[in-house]
Amino acid sequence: MPQDQLPLAPDFAREVIDVPVADEMSESFLAYSLSVITSRAIPDVRDGLKPVQRRILYSMLNMGIRPDGPHRKCARVVGDTMGNFHPHGDSAIYDALVRMGQDFAKNVTLIDPQGNFGSLDEPPAAHRYTECRLTNAAMSMLGELDENTVTFRPTYDGESTEPVYLPGLLPNLLVNGTSGIAVGMATSMAPHNLACLLYTSPSPRDATLSRMPSSA
C-alpha cells in the first residue's frame, strides 16, 4: 500500500505512566470478575434470575406473550431479547429460555413450551421450530413492574430501560434453586418444594418480610 494511503497514526497519550504488572493485573482482574459476576454468571438473590433469564421474561412481557395468549416462535423471543436487552449470542439466550421451560430442570417452570424442548438425553429443536409463552408463575415474578416496585436502569444501548431485578412474588431462588460459574466464584443451590416453603412460614410478620432480599 502506498505511504500516502496508510491510515493515520492514532493519537497516543503524550505521557506514559509506569504501572507495576502485579497492580495492573490485580485491578483489571477484579474489574473483569465483577463484570462477569454481576452481568452474566451469578443469579441475583432478590429474584433468583441471571440477567439473561430476567431479560427473556421481560422481553416476552413487552411482546405480550402471556399465559392467556397464543404461543410464539422462540426465534422471535431470542431476536427481541438479543436486539433490545442482551447483546450476546443467540445460542446462549435460547439455552436459557429452554431451561426455564423444562419441567425436569425446574420445580416451577417460567416458560410454557410448545414443541421439542429436549430431554435428559436429547437437545431441544432449533428455535425456529419451537414456541413458547409465559407461565402464570412467570407473571407472578413480573407483576407490579409498572408500580415503581423495583429499580430500572438503561439498556446496553441506552435506548430503553430494564429492571435490575423482578418484584418476585414467587420465591424463585428457593423454589427452583440456581447454579452459576463466574470468575473466581461459583454458586450452586438446590431447589425446594414450594408447599414446604409455605408451610415453614405460612404467615410471616412484616418485620420478617422487611429483611428479605427482595425488599431491598
Model-found features: residue ranges?
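Catalytic phosphate-handling regions of large nucleic-acid enzymes and associated NTPases
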Residues: 1-201, 205
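Positively charged, low-complexity/disordered segments
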Residues: 203-206, 210-216
